[in-house]
């Protein structure tokens, strides 16, 4: 099914398939942080992220959220719809962590009374700056109607995912979402995994995500395996 490489990003490689409307997303073991300044590899990272994303996409689909997910080709390769990516990264924040604590007078660990939605312009060249509705519309990134729909979807996904993770022993301080257009609809794209979410253990507060690599806080491969064992235990039974 896989034909030629279309694009290689920081942690995934995208391939064309024999179907012009479908792509294969290969989750790699590559690690990057701080806009690619810090790089490494982590054993089985791609596999765990692919399996976690698969589980979450399937769960969200059952809840009525449309995604680009079509199925798995292999343990770390996902078949997805070819979408026109909207150049907005949506970050729902439930607990203060990361950049928000450096940019605003809020202490890490502060639980927000309601989710805070942050929109960033998806651009390595410009450093993914924060944008608002007006800028997105003026730049032609999305219409106001699309932005309203994305905001509504992001809040719904946040509520579903937050509840799901808490039932599996994780807090969800924040995470990143990307959306794309396909067949006249907006669908959830990219991935939802340890690379794109902050997962904190409910009991210990331990980070179980890419912050372990960013700030040299522990063994990332072991942490990703722990997350996978809770969310997709079936892959360890094979």
From Swiss-Prot:
Pathway: Purine metabolism; IMP biosynthesis via de novo pathway; 5-amino-1-(5-phospho-D-ribosyl)imidazole-4-carboxamide from 5-amino-1-(5-phospho-D-ribosyl)imidazole-4-carboxylate: step 1/2. It catalyses: 5-amino-1-(5-phospho-D-ribosyl)imidazole-4-carboxylate + L-aspartate + ATP = (2S)-2-[5-amino-1-(5-phospho-beta-D-ribosyl)imidazole-4-carboxamido]succinate + ADP + phosphate + 2 H(+). It holds the Pfam family SAICAR_synt. Its EC number is 6.3.2.6. Gene3D superfamilies: ATP-grasp fold, B domain, Phosphorylase Kinase, domain 1. Coiled coil: none annotated. SUPFAM superfamilies: SAICAR synthase-like. GO terms for molecular function: ATP binding; phosphoribosylaminoimidazolesuccinocarboxamide synthase activity. Keywords: ATP-binding, Ligase, Nucleotide-binding, Purine biosynthesis. It comes from the Archaea. One of its GO terms (biological process) is cobalamin biosynthetic process. InterPro entries: SAICAR_synt/ADE2_N (IPR028923), SAICAR_synt_PurC (IPR033934), SAICAR_synth (IPR001636), SAICAR_synthetase (IPR050089), SAICAR_synthetase_CS (IPR018236). It is an enzyme of class 6 (ligase). Belongs to the SAICAR synthetase family. This is Phosphoribosylaminoimidazole-succinocarboxamide synthase.
